[in-house]
């Protein structure tokens, strides 16, 4: 444990951020998994709805700094390509 007061505070804030980031990333994985399942089943309408929801989650994660904005863009384009292949 740190002896400096500011570092003790940083440890606490880092832990809170780590837990938030973990939660956001977990929900991203779940959203992407649901989209991929819809694509594999061939349900284009459901996949289209899930693409919008997943893209929104990716954008939110990028704006909060959980993932990089380019990573969000790359994932969104890959999901859109998968939808267009149906």
Swiss-Prot record:
MF (Gene Ontology): small ribosomal subunit rRNA binding; structural constituent of ribosome
Keyword list, A-Z: Ribonucleoprotein, Ribosomal protein, RNA-binding, rRNA-binding
GO terms for cellular component: cytosol; small ribosomal subunit
Entry keyword annotation includes RNA-binding: yes
Gene Ontology terms: biological process: translation
Listed SUPFAM superfamilies: Ribosomal protein S20
Xref: Pfam families: Ribosomal_S20p (PF01649)
Ribonucleoprotein listed as a keyword: yes
Record InterPro entries: Ribosomal_bS20, Ribosomal_bS20_sf
Family: Belongs to the bacterial ribosomal protein bS20 family.
Role description: Binds directly to 16S ribosomal RNA.
Name of this chain's protein: Small ribosomal subunit protein bS20
